[in-house]
């Protein structure tokens, strides 16, 4: 009877340890959210104009400037900043004759750092006002 009890106890301990280990491995760190291209909005997440309004409300209570939405019509490329290419002047470009192998060219590319943003933290995950306050500036 003691032998059976000991086996059951060991199996129980192993099961508990594996469960705890898997629970620790799967959970993201406290206060950090992760998003990917396949992420979907959280059932209690705040998205779109609701998120912008929530952020403006939280930040206005901290005497911080509210977020200004970028005008889609003007965008970032203003007509006066665009330059039409000229075939004659492009021939004088000192970088024109630089040739690199694919391997060499790829060494100049760096992997983007994975960062979380307000949409990731509050739309695709559940967030609190304290999380939103981190995005007040």
From Swiss-Prot:
Presence of keyword Disulfide bond: yes
Propeptide part(s) removed at maturation, as residue ranges: 71-83, 86-110
InterPro entries per UniProt: Insulin-like (IPR016179), Insulin-like_sf (IPR036438), Insulin-rel_pep (IPR016724), Insulin_CS (IPR022353)
SMART domains listed in its UniProt record: IlGF
Secretion signal, residue range per the UniProt entry: 1-31
GO molecular function per UniProt: hormone activity
GO cellular component, one term: transport vesicle
Keyword entries, A-Z: Cleavage on pair of basic residues, Cytoplasmic vesicle, Disulfide bond, Pyrrolidone carboxylic acid, Signal
Disulfide bonds: 47-123, 59-136, 122-127
Tissue specificity of this protein: Expressed in the cerebral light-green cells which are giant neuroendocrines cells involved in the control of growth.
Keyword Disulfide bond: yes
Main location: cytoplasm
Protein localization: Cytoplasmic vesicle, Secretory vesicle
Modified residues (Pyrrolidone carboxylic acid): 32, 113
Record note on quaternary structure: Heterodimer of a B chain and an A chain linked by two disulfide bonds.
Family of this protein: Belongs to the insulin family.
Name assigned to this protein: Molluscan insulin-related peptide 2
Source species of the chain: Lymnaea stagnalis (Great pond snail)
